[in-house]
Amino acid sequence: MTRDEFRRLTEQGAVLLDGATGTNLQKAGMPVGVCPEQWTLEHPKVITELQERYVQAGTNILFAPTFTANRIKLAEYGLAEQLSSMNRELVALSKRAASGRAFVAGDLTMTGAQLYPLGELQFEELVDVYREQAQALYEAGVDLFVVETMMSLQECRAAVLAIREVCELPVMVSLTYQEDGRTLYGTDPVTAVVTLQALGADAVGLNCSTGPAAMLPLVEAMAEYATVPILAKPNAGMPKLVNGETVFDATPEEFAAAGKRLLAAGASILGGCCGTTPEHIRVLGDAVSGGTVRKPLTKSRRVLTSERGFAEIELDGNFLVIGERINPTGKKKLQAELREGNLNLVRQMALEQEENGARILDINMGMNGIDEKEMMLRTVYEVTSTVDTPLCIDSSYVDVIEEALRIYPGRALINSISLESEKIGRLLPVARKYGAMFILLPLSDAGLPKDCEEKHGIIREILARAEENGLSAEDVIVDGLVATVGANPDAALECFETFAYCKHELQIPTVCGLSNISFGLPERMYVNAAFLTMAIAHGLTMAIANPSQELLMNAAFASDMLLHKADSDNRYIGRMNFLSEKYAGMERVLVRTKGSDQKGGNDSSGAKTHSAVYEAVLKGNKNTIVDETKALLSAGMDPDAVINEHLIPAINEVGALFDCQKYFLPQLIASANAMKLAIEYLEPLLKKENRVEKETIVVATVEGDIHDIGKNLVVLMLKNYGYRVIDLGKDVSAETIVEAAVREQAAIIGLSALMTTTMMRMKEVVEQVKAQGVCCKVVIGGAAITESFAEEIGADGYSKDAADCVKLVERLLG
């Protein structure tokens, strides 16, 4: 199947996918804890009969049962060397079931390993893992690919890049979302669809985790931005415990009725996940047959993304600032830190610029004495771990830009592409491959254009070259190419003409660097502010500037209000309120503890202050926390006080920010890891005789489940709060868990399960604890777990995440 054929298929009407595989294999006798792919090959009739029933129910696309047949997952069972043969044989089973009546998609999913910087797995290693499986599936003859049940946008990117480096078959990508409408890693559906369609996915959507009703608003949000078809593959409701068995509560008729609503909302590719059966798919197919398919957008909206957010660039929208500070030019302190390999100032600049209103951050590492490529990659990792703001990759070297775009977990902006023959032929394909937008710089080999006519001609020529490379005007922002008014009195007027030309003739947004206009003049800030105000009136969309320069920022907010842009009055008032609070004294003031009089508490204004240790935990800064901890100790503070007065309050605030969805999993992990370093440093210094030993907690992922991201974070958080934690790992039997609890005299057992097929193993642990009379409470959590399920199996508590688990434990042991 070609990509064009796939697109035509989705335009003809609703495309029907298959339903659940795992829950149906389990019903057919597949035990928990075995490798699903190996069991399927040992029982081929089970999968072929199931998939034949799906085809008879009207399925257009079958998912081959290759879900976890990647090297990392297969290695859990000692089967990594059989990867190629297993994928080939599993695809053959699906092709046999399809018998030419349905297409077969090679199925890939998460590896379970955490990517750097949260884990040890490097991005390129993950691409290799997916490329190996994609190559095997391609050679097996799949018609297309699906990357499904994904929680990490960066893992999605790795999979799509890997497939695209193997072949040009269609690729569908589907993520799984939590009740708050975000993935476990904090990605919202708009960010996901924008990033992945730009990268080359042919359909983007969501599956698993919820029933169809909860998916409806997510599909509606995606449809506003999607230039590709949207996929929806919900569970048959949420899992419940009935007569000792896990069941899903949506009947085929209820499921189909919800499917019709998903179709109307914009999902044209529909199927079922956990708990669905061929009957669910048959009734769904009947319900959506002949229904109107909502066509994707023909023109993409101009949107940049990070892993956890997006910035839309609208021709008539509110003015945006690209923060310029992360650039060593003219910054001796930053240059010195970069030469030492220190990114503390970079991190601080990123946070300050985001706080001061920058919607995009420019990253430039161009200086002598460092490896620019290496430092660019390190900076991209550091900044994306610190802030949610999309990035603009700024370098004179094509290879630096390409490497940064490859590892960037979103859709970035390139600064910049000109008509210089040495670079344009290399940069445009790079922008296309990685789905980036770019700043069009109207320069040519001849240098600066002599007038507006020549400048506009260069703009048109670069646009034509971009279209030849598969890009469009929607991928472009034009740089006005600001010259100094001191040397050319018409410089500002020429820029205004270009801004107006791009807005009204080309319908393309514009950007400029402000500082050139006033070069060589006294009191430059006033010239810059006046130029900015006039430029916005002529159509300027965004500027590369320092968001800490309040005169410029305030002028931009006021200009938007005077031009009556959408919600600009509220934005202006919000800006003034922000400044009022800033100068009245923030609730939190950073204090570096150099002396004994700076231990935290209250400053002279009465405002609450916090130590740099507190701030390091709050911001997840592993680079500084040990030094800041040493500074507190040097100031005379007792190690126990450092923990109780600084570390614990800080991690409590992190938990509160996580609860209100201002922080997401990456920030939670970063903060917990930073605190861990401080605890490890302090531990040998603690006064053991005065230290109260906290209770023991045994933690495990239940038998048959090899997912441990959430469990590992729970372990880390509980240890940071001083509990003695015994981590039994993953795929642990009920007997082993209870034995460990008895042996270690545990006060609590904590159980994790990601898959619906392993939930019932939790009930086994609860039953054994009660049967043996073990004096121990049991708490549970995981993606498919609910509070009602915890009550049904007799558990003592349910936690929705790691931060909640700490509160639950303290409440139970209170």
Residue ranges and their predicted role:
Residues 1-479, 483-814:
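Domain-level signal for soluble alpha/beta catalytic cores
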